[in-house]
């Protein structure tokens, strides 16, 4: 085997999946296929989703392959949300924030992928990759919110209407050249990259904000804004691999990249039919990140194990021009970035892997902008051009084993990330009007540990299988609250237990339970520690009868509880469907079903952060009926492939009404 760029070049080989495709024809506006869902499987809002795409792949010559695709999707979301938030302050009583909003979001997305892989001769090849996306979005929202002190005294109230329209274009291109020398294992590769991103947007804010207390007043805002973001990135990587004999390899590499950003945000105050620029909210900002990184790696392979160690030296330069503030930024950051990997194969079915790597975590262009964002006048955000990159240590361990004779499997996966000079949020709350301002800052460090385990055991006498998968995560970080340092410790434990019973191809029963308990502790006031639990219980059954008929039922019970606020919400969801398999080899399936039979049109999300606990409820698609037809091409071409009850490969056509 050739070891081309063994520190990561093989990742492009992992993206391949099964063949086939899918055509989705939708006749109504309630189907949510392909729409991202939130935790617990309950979507937010009512969504209408249209999607379609086409693949075109062709061998242009014996040595040249063309792979291309186009995909389009349109998502229209109508959402109603209610938010209840308890905010905690150091050495002060807590206060409550409540918000209700009605909004609509419309997104149109186009994506084009084009890859040309040209094998020049037995020693040389070149690969061109291009990804293009274009999107248009439009958001509208009407929001009412209020803040009350701990004794329920009204402190402020806001009514606002926001609009935002945006178009964006992104291009990412790369050219990879690979050369194999006559000496086995000696290789040379170079990869050139180009990235272009253009975003144009405009928005409006109309709000009435009432403040009570010692300085009662009413503030009315009528503003419009325009914003353009332009980014160009150029880079290249050169990698040389030299075999040292005895299945040992030495790699030398060098990477260079520059990111140029231009940001312009202009806010106008509208009053009496006249528009004037607001210099406090407007911002023109240019920046250039320049990365330079030489590195060296050593790898050794043995029959049972292999390992690699290496180090890179990264120099990062940030040059910025704050045009509206007449200020300039010129800073440089330097770090050594070591890496180590170890793999041990006990057998073909038992593996152990350790990985350690370091990285620089640069702030985003949004975090660096010194602009004040007041789209929510009670919750203001501002950037920080003085941010420095964080330095992260990432350690992971992965163990997998499978007994093919007993069909017992087990895996354990753990990660730990320790970041120094980490980027965190600094929040300040004005004690007179309870307006909150957030700003990214550098803090000393933070730590995050995650664990994921799974054990699968068959029970042959009962035609059953049991899976148990505990999970945990620990986060220990620093945030600033009213200029006081607050270390927050967050622990989440939970997991999933699943039982499956199968009787021939007639009956399949699946029972599962998922639990997640999160506890958050604060240094500044332990009496304000928070805890909440989310539970999901699922029962599903598939019954095949009269050879070609199948009855599907599923019942999900979602339970959300807060130990801090006594919040409790339970949501039962019942789905029933009847299928009839048609045509030769049962390649067609006609299905009639009713989803959410109990008409539960609510979803819940609980969140705990550095200084607040929040519950958000959203409207959800209620009871609806669906008729679908699926035609599986792979079963027509291969009658032995694709059984009932599983995922069908090949081409599928679904019609929903």
Residue ranges and their predicted role:
Residues 34-40, 93-100, 153-161, 172, ...:
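Extracytoplasmic loops and strand-loop junctions of Gram-negative outer membrane beta-barrel proteins
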Residues 509-579, 607:
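C-terminal beta-barrel architecture of Gram-negative outer-membrane proteins
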Residues 336-342, 395, 412, 493-501, ...:
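Feature captures outer-membrane beta-barrel proteins of Gram-negative bacteria and organelles
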Residues 100, 233-235, 267, 276-286, ...:
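Outer membrane beta-barrel strand-and-loop segments of large Gram-negative receptors
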Residues 250-352, 523-525:
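Signature of Gram-negative outer-membrane beta-barrel scaffolds
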Residues 3-6, 79-95, 139-154, 200-211, ...:
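Outer-membrane beta-barrel translocator domains and adjoining extracellular loop/strand segments
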Residues 1-142, 162-201, 239-262, 297-299, ...:
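Membrane-proximal, glycine/serine-rich, low-complexity loop/turn segments characteristic
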């Amino acid at each position: 085997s050739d070891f081309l760029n063994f520190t990561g070049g093989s990742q492009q080989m992992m993206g391949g999946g099964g063949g086939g495709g899918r055509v989705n024809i939708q006749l109504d506006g309630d189907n949510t296929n392909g729409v991202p869902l939130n935790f617990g499987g309950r979507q937010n809002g009512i969504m209408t989703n249209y999607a379609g795409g086409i693949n075109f792949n062709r061998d242009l010559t014996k040595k040249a392959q063309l792979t291309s695709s186009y995909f389009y999707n349109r998502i229209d979301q109508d959402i109603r949300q209610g938010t209840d938030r308890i905010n905690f302050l150091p050495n002060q009583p807590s206060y409550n924030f409540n918000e209700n909003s009605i909004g609509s979001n419309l997104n149109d997305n186009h994506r084009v992928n084009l890859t040309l892989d040209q094998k020049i001769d037995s020693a040389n090849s070149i690969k061109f990759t291009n990804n293009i996306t274009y999107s248009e979005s439009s958001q509208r929202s009407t929001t009412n919110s209020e803040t009350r002190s701990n004794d329920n005294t009204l402190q402020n109230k806001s009514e606002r209407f926001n609009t935002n329209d945006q178009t964006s274009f992104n291009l990412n291109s790369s050219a990879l050249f690979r050369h194999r020398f006559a000496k086995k294992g000696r290789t040379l590769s170079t990869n050139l990259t180009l990235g272009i991103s253009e975003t144009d947007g405009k928005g409006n804010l109309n709000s009435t904000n009432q403040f009570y207390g010692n300085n009662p007043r009413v503030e009315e805002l009528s503003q419009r804004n325009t914003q353009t973001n332009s980014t160009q990135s150029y880079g290249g990587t050169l990698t040389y691999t030299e075999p040292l004999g005895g299945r040992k390899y030495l790699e030398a590499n060098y990477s260079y990249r520059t990111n140029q950003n231009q940001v312009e945000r202009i806010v106008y105050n509208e009053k009496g039919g006249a528009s004037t620029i607001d210099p406090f909210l407007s911002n023109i900002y240019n920046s250039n990140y320049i990365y330079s990184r030489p590195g060296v790696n050593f790898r050794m392979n043995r029959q049972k194990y292999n390992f690699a160690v290496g180090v890179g030296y990264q120099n990062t330069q940030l040059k910025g021009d704050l045009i509206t503030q007449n200020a300039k930024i010129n800073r440089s950051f330097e770090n050594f970035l070591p890496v180590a990997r170890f793999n041990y194969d006990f057998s073909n079915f038992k593996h152990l892997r350790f990985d350690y790597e370091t990285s620089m975590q640069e702030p985003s262009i949004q975090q660096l902008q010194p602009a004040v964002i007041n789209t929510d006048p009670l919750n203001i955000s501002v950037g920080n051009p003085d941010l420095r990159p964080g330095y992260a240590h990432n350690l992971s361990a992965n163990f997998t084993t499978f007994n093919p004779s007993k069909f017992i499997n087990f895996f354990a996966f753990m990660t730990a990330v320790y970041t120094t000079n980490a980027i965190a949020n600094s929040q300040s709350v004005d004690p007179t009007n309870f307006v909150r301002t957030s700003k990214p800052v550098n803090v000393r460090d933070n730590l995050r540990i995650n664990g994921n385990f799974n054990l699968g055991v068959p029970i042959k006498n009962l035609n059953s299988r049991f899976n148990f998968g505990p999970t945990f995560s620990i986060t220990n970080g620093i945030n600033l609250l009213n200029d006081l340092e607050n270390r927050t410790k967050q622990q989440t434990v939970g997991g999933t237990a699943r039982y499956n019973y199968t009787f021939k191809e007639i009956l399949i029963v699946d029972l599962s339970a998922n639990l997640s308990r999160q506890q958050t502790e604060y240094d500044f006031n332990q009496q304000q520690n928070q805890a909440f639990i989310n539970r999901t219980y699922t029962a599903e059954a598939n019954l095949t009868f009269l050879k070609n008929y199948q009855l599907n039922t599923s019942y999900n019970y979602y339970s959300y509880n807060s130990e801090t606020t006594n919040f409790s919400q339970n949501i039962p969801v019942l789905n029933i469907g009847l299928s009839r398999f048609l045509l030769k080899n049962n390649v067609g399936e006609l299905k009639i079903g009713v989803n959410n039979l109990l008409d539960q049109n609510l979803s819940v999300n609980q969140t705990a952060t550095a200084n607040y606990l929040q519950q958000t409820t959203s409207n959800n698609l209620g009871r609806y009926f669906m008729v679908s037809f699926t035609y599986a091409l792979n079963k027509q071409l291969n009658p032995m492939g694709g059984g009932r009850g599983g995922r069908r490969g090949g081409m599928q056509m679904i019609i929903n009404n």
